Amino acid sequence: MLTLKIAVYIVVSFFVLLFIFGFLSGDPTRNPGRKDFE
């Protein structure tokens, strides 16, 4: 049960970091080249 909880925490933290980095790097207001993002 402990390994399952650890795996869930790892997956959740990974997606959160991915979302944060993707939002910061692909922010339309700071990135004029939106054609590359799409």
From Swiss-Prot:
Protein name, entry field: Photosystem II reaction center protein I
Primary localisation category: membrane
PANTHER family: PHOTOSYSTEM II REACTION CENTER PROTEIN I
Gene Ontology biological process terms in this record: photosynthesis
Membrane-crossing residue ranges in chain numbering: 6-26
UniProt entry tagged with the keyword Membrane: yes
Function, as annotated: One of the components of the core complex of photosystem II (PSII), required for its stability and/or assembly. PSII is a light-driven water:plastoquinone oxidoreductase that uses light energy to abstract electrons from H(2)O, generating O(2) and a proton gradient subsequently used for ATP formation. It consists of a core antenna complex that captures photons, and an electron transfer chain that converts photonic excitation into a charge separation.
Subcellular location(s) of the protein: Cellular thylakoid membrane
SUPFAM superfamilies named in the record: Photosystem II reaction center protein I, PsbI
Subunit structure: PSII is composed of 1 copy each of membrane proteins PsbA, PsbB, PsbC, PsbD, PsbE, PsbF, PsbH, PsbI, PsbJ, PsbK, PsbL, PsbM, PsbT, PsbX, PsbY, PsbZ, Psb30/Ycf12, peripheral proteins PsbO, CyanoQ (PsbQ), PsbU, PsbV and a large number of cofactors. It forms dimeric complexes.
Membership in a protein family: Belongs to the PsbI family.
InterPro entries linked: PSII_PsbI, PSII_PsbI_sf
Gene Ontology CC terms: photosystem II reaction center; plasma membrane-derived thylakoid membrane
Keywords: Membrane, Photosynthesis, Photosystem II, Reaction center, Thylakoid, Transmembrane, Transmembrane helix
Membrane topology reported for the UniProt record: Single-pass membrane protein
Pfam families: PsbI (PF02532)
Keyword rRNA processing: no
